[in-house]
C-alpha cells in the first residue's frame, strides 16, 4: 500500500487516469435483468463509491469514515486521523452545485472540538450524464471548505433554511466568472467568522454564541500550537456582498 496526499490523488486522477476523458456507465443487475441506469440523481453517490474502489485497486492507503453525517469520507493517514482528510462531492455540471457541506449545528459543534476538520480537502467531480446513461467527468476540483462557500442574503453563510429552521451548509458557485455573484470566502478566518455569526443568528444555536469564538480559538491553539485570530463578522461582511 502507498500513502498519497489529497493533492497527489487529484494529480493522479488528472494526469495518469485522464479522468476528464474517461467514459462510464452505471449498470444494475437483478436476476436475469441488466440495465443501464439513466437517473442523474444517483451519480454522485456512485462516484464516491467508485473512488473508494479506485483507491483499493491502485493500492492507495485509506480508511472509510463511519460517520456519514460529517466530513470526511476518507482518512488518507490511518495512523493520524487529524491529517489528510478527504471528502468527495459530485454534482451535475449542467446545473449549480446541489450537494450539502454538512449539517450546520453538527458542524459548528464539531469544529470547536476538532478544528482540524476545517482542513478537510474536498475532491469535487462535475459530471454529465447523457440520455443513454453515459457518464463523463467535465471538471475536477480540489478545494478547502472556505473556497467553496459564501454568504447569502440575511445570513452570514449560505444555508438551507426551511420554515425558518436552519439545516445544511450549502456551497456557492466557486467556478463562476459572474462578478455579480456573491464571492467565496477569502480565507479560513473569514469562513469561521461567518460560522460564529450564524451560531448567533440561528435560534437553535444562539445559546452557544457568547463563548463559541473563544472555545474555537482555544481548541485551534491547543491542536496546532499556534494562535488564530477570528475577526467579527461586522468587520468583514462588506467583502462578501453582491457587487
Curated annotation (Swiss-Prot):
Catalytic activity: Endonucleolytic cleavage of DNA to give specific double-stranded fragments with terminal 5'-phosphates
GO biological process, one term: DNA restriction-modification system
This protein's record includes keyword Repeat: no
Keyword Signal in record: no
InterPro entries assigned to the protein according to its UniProt record, in alphabetical order: Restrct_endonuc_II_NlaIV
Record's keyword terms, sorted: Endonuclease, Hydrolase, Nuclease, Restriction system
GO MF, any single term: type II site-specific deoxyribonuclease activity
EC numbers on record: 3.1.21.4
The name this protein goes by in its record: Type II restriction enzyme NlaIV
Organism: Neisseria lactamica
Gene name of the encoded protein: nlaIVR
Amino acid at each position: 500500500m502507498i500513502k498519497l496526499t489529497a493533492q497527489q490523488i487529484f494529480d493522479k486522477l488528472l494526469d495518469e487516469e485522464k479522468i476528464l476523458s474517461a467514459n462510464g456507465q452505471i449498470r444494475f443487475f437483478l436476476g436475469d435483468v441488466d440495465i443501464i441506469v439513466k437517473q442523474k440523481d444517483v451519480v454522485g453517490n456512485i462516484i464516491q463509491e467508485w473512488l473508494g474502489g479506485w483507491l483499493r485497486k491502485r493500492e492507495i492507503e485509506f480508511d472509510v469514515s463511519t460517520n456519514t453525517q460529517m466530513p470526511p469520507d476518507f482518512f488518507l493517514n490511518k495512523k493520524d486521523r487529524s491529517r489528510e482528510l478527504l471528502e468527495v462531492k459530485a454534482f451535475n455540471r449542467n446545473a449549480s452545485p446541489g450537494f450539502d457541506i454538512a449539517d450546520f449545528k453538527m458542524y459548528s459543534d464539531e469544529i470547536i472540538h476538532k478544528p482540524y476538520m476545517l482542513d478537510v480537502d474536498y475532491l469535487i467531480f462535475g459530471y454529465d450524464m447523457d440520455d443513454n446513461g453515459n457518464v463523463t467527468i467535465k471538471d475536477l476540483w480540489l478545494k478547502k471548505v472556505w473556497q467553496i462557500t459564501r454568504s447569502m442574503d440575511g445570513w452570514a453563510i449560505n444555508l438551507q433554511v426551511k420554515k425558518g429552521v436552519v439545516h445544511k451548509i450549502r456551497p456557492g458557485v466557486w467556478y463562476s466568472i459572474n462578478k455579480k455573484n456573491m464571492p467565496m470566502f477569502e480565507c479560513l478566518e473569514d469562513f469561521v467568522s461567518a460560522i460564529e455569526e450564524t451560531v448567533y443568528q440561528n435560534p437553535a444555536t444562539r445559546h452557544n454564541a457568547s463563548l463559541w469564538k473563544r472555545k474555537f480559538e482555544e481548541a485551534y491553539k491547543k491542536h496546532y500550537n499556534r494562535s488564530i485570530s477570528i475577526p467579527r463578522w461586522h468587520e468583514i461582511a462588506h467583502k462578501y456582498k453582491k457587487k
